[in-house]
Amino acid sequence: MERSLAVIIPVFCSTTTVRQLVTDLKEVFGPSCRLHIFLIDDGNEASVRKYLTENCLLEQVTLITLKKNYGQQNAVFCGLEKAAGYDYVATMDDDLKHPAQELYRLWEKIQEGYDLVYGVPELDGKTKVKYSAGSRIRDILFSCGLKCPAGMRVSSFRIMTKEVAKDVVTGHCGDFFYFSAAALKKKRKVANVTYLPQKEQRSSGYTLKKRIRLFLGIVWNYSLPFGRKNTQPLYEIDEIYPRLMVLGGSQCQLHALQRAKAQGMYTVLADYTKCPAGAAYADIHEPVSTFDADACLAAAKKHWVQGIMTMGTDQPVYTAALVSEALSLPSCLTAAQALLVTNKKYMKIRLAETGIPTVPWMLINKDTTEEEVKKLRPPYVIKPLDSQGQRGIFKLDTAAEVLAHLEQTLEFSRCEEALLEEFYENDEMTVSGYISKGKLIILSVVDRLVYPDPVHIGVCIGHRYPSVHIGEYETIRTISEDVVRVMGLQEGPFYLQLLKGKNGIVVNELACRIGGAFEDVTIPWLTGFDLLDAVMKNALGHPVDVSGYENFRCDQTEKEVAVQLMFCEPGEIATLTEREELLKLPFVMDCGYNFREGSVIPSLENATARFGHAVITGTKETIAENIDLFYEKLSVKNTEGKEMILRLYPEKKERYIV
């Protein structure tokens, strides 16, 4: 598993060296780990902020500007709080005094099992005199008053494990902070690595008077049991860059918000619901509809976002493109392209014009007659042009039923027309991939399993990988590549629903997003390609590296995945198994609930009734047993003590085959 490293760089009045340092770090650590750099601007000067935002906001960089100068130690504390979750955390100065190549040596040293490694300069005759004037007193103080090993030197150039970083942050109280004093309160395995500093260094800002005050602060706050007082915060944040807007805060978008938070981004969540799941991970929750492009645009302007994205949902893709176009933000799609892949009218017209196979269809409105409907063969399927989650979709037997249901379908649409199709008996498949420079990389082909309701059709109850029709991979690939071509897609995620029936494979619909069956979890496990990371890079205008996937084939793997999109009997939930208990099962990669105790689950008519999800992994030999073990662990009971969970895919003890 790839290790992660966060590098914290306090910045004070630097307008010449930071870009070079960031570039050096990315070059040195690029192939070694998942790197993220936190620049903490501790001066709050307009010229410095301008330099940092215009020159240093590269990929893998977060810029945090503080409201005033709080000092290097407090800036480090800010970075430590934001870097939670990384395997290792390093701190270094902004003036190139600490070379990136030397940090790599610290990185190698800590892999030997150390908790904390300091980089310290080699001492020649001249440096030794300067060092002994102040730093030696500090080191003696650390050796005598704290648990620092004798002879150990400390500095602002260091790398630590995530456990040390967490201890330092959670164990702090008061308005004085000094990293080494906080870290060495406990016994640690510590090491020094010496290096030759750069010739040109910024002179230390510590006068003798400041050093004495600092030493007294260390003694008072870390050596005396009565010294520490909790009075005021160590810092206040003014701005965080980049600023990412996420459209939607349900379980389907939760991982994007969690990832953005882990990377130190400032996130603005647009979701009209009062308390969406994602709000806990967002910096700002704007209660606006993701369908309302004007409201989302106003929110994006208000918070000066640098990127906007969504996942797991269709219509916000169009909203994101409109906002991006209005604000000149990065986007894989123009507004016109986004309309093509989110509105079934324009989608069907383009597919028909270019010869892509689909089922027979027509557009209907309130003036449509039964005779016009009868131009298609029954049974019929009626759909809104611009909705999602199977809302307003019905399978109907007669033209009269179609016209009777039209008004109900249009309730889920902003259009005055609806799509009418001939029903095609089929197995549904979903293709997920990524498009780079116009070329599609297919990452998975799954069976999209649906609830067998005779009227409310298309409600997905699970994904099965690999598809039982994977033997037709070449046909699937050809159709998928043709769709990419005729839609003019050049970059970004790709999602295609196919129908396999007696007349072959036809296209149902497509989207330019990560699917709603947690493909951001399954695809990295199956392929190693981080699809969520790619989409977030798209939103911020960063390049996506697809090297190694140019000739990738997803039909050559022994891994299997069963995504459970779970539903329950309608009623009020009294008790349910805690999510953490299910995640203890070694084959459960992810799971989540859309309802909690006290929630009332509606009847199953569309995807809004979904209780939750689980991503279950295995092999051909183990997947069926793993699914059974999961459902044996899961319990959802109503107020009468009866189990509510519906075992839809596959039925209990049914073998994992068609």
Question: Where in the sequence are the language-model features?
Answer:
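ATP-binding N-terminal substructure of ATP-dependent carboxylate-amine bond-forming enzymes
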Residues: 231-337, 542-543, 550-551, 568, ...
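Hydrophobic helical membrane-anchoring modules
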Residues: 1-4, 14-16, 20, 181-239
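Acceptor/aglycone-binding surface of glycosyltransferases and processive sugar-polymer synthases
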Residues: 67-68, 73-83, 88, 100-177, ...
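A conserved helix-loop-beta module that forms one wall/lid of the active-site cleft
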Residues: 325-392
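Active-site "cap" helix and flanking loop/linker of ATP-utilizing ligase/carboxylase catalytic domains
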Residues: 475-496, 502, 511-576
